């Protein structure tokens, strides 16, 4: 069995960003394993989907590019693009992995992690590895939330404009629902969105709750150009049936909607479906239980990183949010390993707003 001090599962933005930060904290012997290739989830985005956070090379002025995973990189600088496609962002991740000479083993699936005598045993397609620390960076894109018997999930669609039909029904009311609606409207089809709630007109300033300006602007432009998009709020779907070449969407209020095209399910993702999450973390009311250090409450030295981390009102679903935890966790590991503390390095991360050690500072308030 091959032993590594740090074992990171997932070679996406979180996994690679964490590895780079550990490297900067002089923590060696880090292995990253990925079931596909680097940036696997990004490569499977719909072709029209782009980052909703804009990239801009702000490095050097207190905050790196919002989509950067390391403080001295910038996708905007690399590609001269503001909103980046999934395939392009995966290319950025590959460039960064090469630049920092990260140890990444691709096309390697992890089936199980067990804790034996203070050491983690990680079962993979290529045998068992052992490790002292486990970082789960698998994200949620591989685990779509699809609670219905019929319907096509947003993540399963490669090109919206190639779908056949003159009318489509979308279940869901946030980013992916509006992205699907905007793209489908380009074909001239009539789009009906049904949702129990939406971030479209939320008063909350937090972009994890409120619909992003990028999507708001795209929606406004589409409607001004004649897009046929209808919004129905207060409709919670509980069942989708299919009979006589027609889909029926059943809502809690008794309303039934008929659709001749397969409904598009834009209900997000459910990371608790991940077998590794089930093995290593406690789940209560569909929420992963974490300590204030993003550590498992079941096992020591097992951390969750990336967009699936939640702490009360702090939702780390954007790269610029969750990357701020990398240095905090790297610092924690260095202390547990008895390594010398580099206060100047910590300060450099603080100066770049990439050292979030207090979740109580995450309230987003705007006066206007």
Predicted regions and their residues:
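N-terminal Rossmann-like FAD-binding beta1-loop-alpha1 element of flavoenzymes
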Residues: 4-31, 168-186
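Short hydrophobic core segments
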Residues: 7-9, 127-141, 169-171, 258-270
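Glycine-rich active-site loop/strand segments that organize a redox cofactor
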Residues: 35-90, 194-210
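Glycine-rich dinucleotide-binding loop and its adjacent helix/turn
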Residues: 85-88, 133-187, 193, 283-293, ...
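Helical element adjacent to the flavin cofactor pocket in flavoenzyme catalytic cores
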Residues: 86-104, 110, 138-142, 216-231
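A conserved short coil-to-beta-strand element within the FAD-binding core of flavoproteins
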Residues: 106-120, 233-245
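A Rossmann-like FAD-binding core segment of flavoenzymes
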Residues: 188-282, 341-349
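C-terminal, flexible cofactor-proximal segment of oxidoreductases
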Residues: 270, 287-368
